[in-house]
Amino acid sequence: MSQAVKDYYEILGVNRDATKEEIKKAYRKLVRIYHPDINPDPSAQEKFKEINEAYHVLIDDERRSEYDAILSRNDVGKFRDFLEYIQEFVESIIQGEKGKKRRPRKGQDIKMKLPLTLEEAGLGCEKEIIYSRWMDCPVCEGMGVKGEAETVVCHACNGEGRRVSGIFNFPRPCSVCKGKGFIVKNPCPTCYGRGRVSAQHKIKVHIPPGTEEGEVLKVPEKGHLGYFGGKPGDLYLKVVLKEHPIFKKVGKDLHMEKVVSFPLAVLGGTVKVPTLEGEEIDVFIQPGTECGATKVVKEKGYPYENGRGDLIIHIRIGVPKNLSKSERKLLEKLAESIKEEGEEVYREGGSLVEKLSSLFKKNA
């Protein structure tokens, strides 16, 4: 599941047509609230980073224009690349890393939904999944250049990799060389000099028995590639149970409908019923079972850590649609003997009451 496009205007609390002065004013106000030296709350540090993210995007005309285009199209893919760079230089600003070697940093986590059948989630399985992940470019092996690197000193920052600007004179990574201090003359044509590409990745994930809807499975170090030699991020899979053609899961129980014939409902007998394992079991139906009755089969429901729920069968009585003449006569004879008081059973060709009613309508 991809990173959503953040609304930096909302984060700073300004309108989308806000001037630079309005952006600076909103930024100063929020910094006084969330700066780590002022606010000791651990959550304030993350909020402070996000505020700086928003400010350093919106205060720069070129960067703001690029962001506005991404936001208007809700282009999650473009924003992922954009966010990676923004977070990198904001962190370097906050940490005061000017002129220092970049330290290894863990890659971004990946969060996505994992659709599972009831069988896969309930009984457990090894599930193969394919997803997109940032990896080293296979052509340049993560170097970002084609062949031997040909570089020139960045004219914008004179090789410093940083330029001082902004209301607090913060050193910011140079937007021309992306903070490197040099410009590669022969960037890799596959990754455009980034050293990494988004590639399809295939893994097998263990699904434990009794996995529930909404449960999140963590797969360590299967997220995006790390930065500067750092570890990859983690992969988080949120379980979504698919609709089942037979069973409906309610808590730990499985519910299903079973159609039985009228004679079996009256006389009793056994029917074949499927289980989650794909087997069939014999279930006894009591004589005189009515439509809508339920039959509970213990411990044949959804698995969980210490056992299993029940299988609850909702009985429906099937009504035959096409009867032969002999079958109809037998049923008519039976109906006469077991019908309730006040009932008039239609015979073939209509009942006496029906014929008299039709005659009166013709003479009216």
Swiss-Prot record:
SUPFAM superfamilies: Chaperone J-domain (SSF46565), DnaJ/Hsp40 cysteine-rich domain (SSF57938), HSP40/DnaJ peptide-binding domain (SSF49493)
Name of the protein in question: Chaperone protein DnaJ 1
Domain notes: The J domain is necessary and sufficient to stimulate DnaK ATPase activity. Zinc center 1 plays an important role in the autonomous, DnaK-independent chaperone activity of DnaJ. Zinc center 2 is essential for interaction with DnaK and for DnaJ activity.
UniProt function note: Participates actively in the response to hyperosmotic and heat shock by preventing the aggregation of stress-denatured proteins and by disaggregating proteins, also in an autonomous, DnaK-independent fashion. Unfolded proteins bind initially to DnaJ; upon interaction with the DnaJ-bound protein, DnaK hydrolyzes its bound ATP, resulting in the formation of a stable complex. GrpE releases ADP from DnaK; ATP binding to DnaK triggers the release of the substrate protein, thus completing the reaction cycle.
Positions of Zn(2+) 1 binding: 137, 140, 188, 191
Any one GO molecular-function label of the UniProt entry: ATP binding
Chain intervals annotated as zinc finger (CR-type): 124-200
Cofactor(s) listed in the protein's UniProt record: Zn(2+)
J domain span: 7-71
Compartments where located: Cytoplasm
Lineage, uppermost ranks: Bacteria, Pseudomonadati, Aquificota, Aquificia, Aquificales
Organism: Aquifex aeolicus (strain VF5)
Record's keyword annotation contains Aminoacyl-tRNA synthetase: no
CDD domains the record matches: DnaJ, DnaJ_C, DnaJ_zf
Pfam families: DnaJ, DnaJ_C, DnaJ_CXXCXGXG
